[in-house]
């Protein structure tokens, strides 16, 4: 192999290694900013064909309906909890702060936070659904499922999910 061809080969290898290293570092840096979207049923029963459940401490977003009668507020602090449900189950969300004005029981909601033990989401942000136009696509897909059953029907599903 002549020296000119050898130096080009070395240069090509170095460039490919540099691109690979740069891509790896960028993906590693962005990893902490990736929040996967789940519905309550996907948290309880797993997501996709492999039924992957979120790990404790994983950042995620959850979308569903606020279960009527589930909102509990602490009178002395801004802490509160409520259940978010879909056709496949219900999950408890805890939040500290002031809720959006449009937050109501029976309304659509998206909460962003960290998955904790007991199928609980410790939310850092809660967004209330206010108009069909502003619903994120993944929430719109999740909401196509049947939400017409009474909220009481989901309490037994949530209890089963918390027991596992």
Curated annotation (Swiss-Prot):
Q: What is its main location?
A: membrane
**Where can this protein be found?**
Cell inner membrane
Q: Which HAMAP family match?
A: CcmE
* UniProt: heme binding residues: 130, 134
Q: Which UniProt keywords apply?
A: Cell inner membrane, Cell membrane, Cytochrome c-type biogenesis, Heme, Iron, Membrane, Metal-binding, Signal-anchor, Transmembrane, Transmembrane helix
Report the GO terms under cellular component: plasma membrane
Periplasmic side: which ranges? 30-164
Listed Gene3D superfamilies: Nucleic acid-binding proteins
GO MF, one term, reads: heme binding
Q: Which processes are annotated in GO (biological process)?
A: cytochrome complex assembly
Q: Where is this region: Disordered?
A: 131-164
**Listed PANTHER family:** CYTOCHROME C-TYPE BIOGENESIS PROTEIN CCME HOMOLOG, MITOCHONDRIAL
Matching InterPro entries: CcmE (IPR004329), CcmE-like_sf (IPR036127), NA-bd_OB-fold (IPR012340)
Q: How does it sit in the membrane?
A: Single-pass type II membrane protein
Q: Which gene encodes it?
A: ccmE
Q: Where are the transmembrane segments?
A: 9-29
Where are the compositionally biased (Basic and acidic residues) regions? 131-150
Protein name stated in the entry: Cytochrome c-type biogenesis protein CcmE
Which NCBIfam families does the entry link to? PRK13150.1, PRK13165.1, PRK13254.1-1, PRK13254.1-3, PRK13254.1-5
